[in-house]
Amino acid sequence: MSLSTEAKAQIIAEFGRDVNDSGSSEVQIALLTAQINHLQGHFSEHKKDHHSRRGLLRMVSQRRKLLDYLKRKNVTSYTALIGRLGLRR
């Protein structure tokens, strides 16, 4: 249920500071968002997959923590990122 290598590389190229930047907060948040969106489709078919739902909740929590960190450190980057990702905030 993870993203393909090509999809990850595309996200890193789009949100990272350079091609090898996979650790910045913006890239991590974008990768988690893509993975969360991918799992949303999975749950429309598999409603009783509670094991994966726990993983989804863990990803959402991790994204929330990273968004809070980014908001504390760099508000302009935070607002730009949530606008680009289309998150409700």
Swiss-Prot record:
PROSITE patterns: RIBOSOMAL_S15 (PS00362). The keyword RNA-binding applies. Transmembrane segments: none annotated. Keywords: Ribonucleoprotein, Ribosomal protein, RNA-binding, rRNA-binding. One of its GO terms (biological process) is translation. GO terms for molecular function: rRNA binding; structural constituent of ribosome. Part of the 30S ribosomal subunit. Forms a bridge to the 50S subunit in the 70S ribosome, contacting the 23S rRNA. One of the primary rRNA binding proteins, it binds directly to 16S rRNA where it helps nucleate assembly of the platform of the 30S subunit by binding and bridging several RNA helices of the 16S rRNA. This is Small ribosomal subunit protein uS15. It comes from Photorhabdus laumondii subsp. laumondii (strain DSM 15139 / CIP 105565 / TT01) (Photorhabdus luminescens subsp. laumondii).
